Amino acid sequence: MTKETKKTTKTASAYQPTLQKLYQEKVLPALLKEMGVKSPMAAPKLEKIVINIGVKEAREDIKALDIAKDDLTAIAGQASQVRRAKKSISNFKLREGMPIGVRVTLRGARMFEFMERFINIACPRIRDFQGFNPSFDGRGNLNLGIKEHYIFPEIDVEKSPKAYGMNITFVTSAKNDKDGTLLMQYMGMPFKKSAK
């Protein structure tokens, strides 16, 4: 290994997304103080982000699935997977093994990069946006529904003629909704202001 190769390896591994730095430098100490715990391991942290797009047109038109897959890959910065039906449902004309959507799971640096783009770029592009309802699942995980994936600047409207809805799940290590809400607020998630 030459000296230049060693230098590039060091700088590549030293890269840290802005939101990850913010978590370590400001959010974590604030959480420890507010929760009254001393160990950083006891504080909640973001573990992964799961993004899912359901494509009902995939039954008749496989191109719709390819478009959704390409769009989700562009949004997430990581290859997406095709999700298939686990069982047959005759009312929906669905057979086991049919493609029904695409999904991607983000961890590490990509997770923080996506969350930063989502909060700072995509959310302000939502029409009449007043903030999200804090819809947690009882175990500190936040679920958000997005009506149009066009809010992401990576999507080309010419190549993607149909607007797809998305489900985004922020999986945290929080034990309850109160701790999960606290973590997401400190990370900058825009929640609706409660009417007092």
What name fits each language-model region?
Residues 1-196:
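Ribosome-associated RNA-binding proteins
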